[in-house]
Every structure is written in C-alpha cells, then in structure tokens.
Amino acid sequence: MLVFYHKDNDGYCSAAVCNCYLVNGYDMPSNEDFIPYTHGETLDISSLREIREGERVYILDLAMDDVILELTMHCLSAGAVVVHIDHHKSGKDYIDALPDVTKAALDRYAKSTKFIQLFETALSACMLTYIYSSMNMDVEDPNSEQLHPMDVSFATTPDWTTIVINPGVKERKIVIPLAVRYCDDYDVWRWFHKDTEAFNLGFEAVPYRNNPCSKEWAALLNKERITVPPIVNAGYNIIGYRDAQYKRICEHGFEATICGVDCYVVNTPYGDSKLFGEKINEYPMCVMYRYSGKYKKYKLEFRSGDNGIDVSEVAKALGGGGHFHAAGCEIDNIDHVILHKESVTFME
C-alpha cells in the first residue's frame, strides 16, 4: 500500500482512516508509505520506491492536476490499483478538460477496475474515505467479492452521524467517528456540529496530527469517548484568543482587485475564512497572502461568502484551484496580481 495525502486536517484524517480501516494483512504499509503533499510542492515521482503489481495506491484529498495526473499514470503503468478520493471542484474541471486520448486511457483503467475514483464536492475527503472503507465493512461473507464504488449508492443521515450504504436496498448503517465528522464539517464549511470549530482548533496543536500510522490516531478514531473531549476543550480555550487576533490582523487589510475582481486583502501567514468577519459578505471575495521563504513563492488563499463568487475560477486563472468558496494558488510574484484599489480605475 502507498498513500499520498494532502497536508491539512482533512488530508491527515483521510490518511488515518485509510491506515485504520483499509489495510489488510497482505499489504501492510510502513510510515514511509504515507506521503504528505500539498499542491505547489515538488513531488519527485522518479524517487518513489518500486510499486508492486496489484498494489493499492491511495491518493487522498489531492485535486487532479498535472502532478497528480503524472503520479496516477506512473502508478497505473506499474500495475497498481489507484484509488483517487477527492472533492475539489478544480480537480473535476481539470479532468473534464483533459485531451480525449488521456481521458480514454483513464477510462480503460477504470473499466478494468485499476483506476477507482470517488468524488463528491459536498463531502470532505476524509468523509469520502470513510465511506469508501465502509462499503465493504461488516459484510456477512468476508470472502464475497469486494464492492466497487461505481456499484454502490450511499447517503448520510440528516444529523451527519451515520453513513447509509445502499439506502433502501439491503441497506447498512455505519456510525461515523467523531473526528471524521468534525474534520468533514470544517473542511466543507458546513458548521452543522456545535463542537466543529473547537475540535479543529484544538487539533492544530495535536503532535500526532501528521502521523496517520500512530496509535494515537487509531485511538482518536476508535476510542473517541476518551480521546476527543480533551481536544474539544483545548479548542474552546483557543477560540477567544484567536478571535481577538483575527480582529487585529483584519484591521490592517486593504481593498484591491485581483483578476478584475474587487476584494479585501490581508497579508498574514495565519487564518481561515473567519479571519474576515463580516467583510466576507461585503466583498465578492476576500484574500489572504503570504510569502514562503522556503519555497520562494507567494501563497494566496481566496474565500467568499454565501453570496460571493466562485473563487476556484480566480485560483485556476493563477495556476491553482480548490472549491467554490475556498481556493488557493502559489505564484512567483504579486506585483501585477494584487492591485491596490487606489491604483486602478474601476468601471461603473
């Protein structure tokens, strides 16, 4: 087994779910087989270990782009079964725009069940990974043929606590672990559960967060009555301080235009959509940016409110991608990208 996953809470949780529920005795992974990655970084595919015929390769919470497509084709060519689980709108747009010959190649692998995709923008990757693991969980006959995602329907209960596999037709109900619920709720910005924000803030300080093979992650998923409350309590202690810092940071923002879109911009290495307060609903989009000395690039993160624009389109125009209300990109220079409002003339 080889697992590539996004370096954020959703990706970490996806990888941990994979380790806890998708490992079998014939394909035991090591810590080195779990590879964190974020778009914009270098992924040296030539340096990967040899992939075995029939080995499963999971690509979790990583939108399809040039790098992920190269990784996918490399693994498929080596005889692996590639399972790509994602929920980013830009990834679907990328696949839709691929040349016909590339689409045909992926379709051939899909028809031979070598390339398995599970995609849904309304759910996070960790929720989709847990759903994928649940498709063959608790089946009466362990020797029965494994279910394929294309042949399985699924739903969640209205309270987002339970997965229903094949609803209405020999349906099975499987309870969703709290950590998966909270990471999902936060990542898609649904905010259904009252402890979602507290859990995700507290989770930022957890030392094993990016160690999906750890016994602590296994306990978080399987012994949640003991392991989840301390994280939630720590998060509630953080919220007040965080809000005060957000207010101070946001006061130093400025109005600008990016790709022709009016926006409110803040230069900060820290923050999420809540950084902008009510401004998120006062502008078509809000933007955070920072410079990474490590990668010598500017990181831009785009956010929009309920009535805002599709920021994934702005991100794509700058070489990035993401979701409708949350997206990002990395660029070499911002001089002609972020234009202060007083330096441009807007059409009425």
What do these predicted ranges mean?
Residues 212-239:
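Long, charge-rich alpha-helical interaction segments
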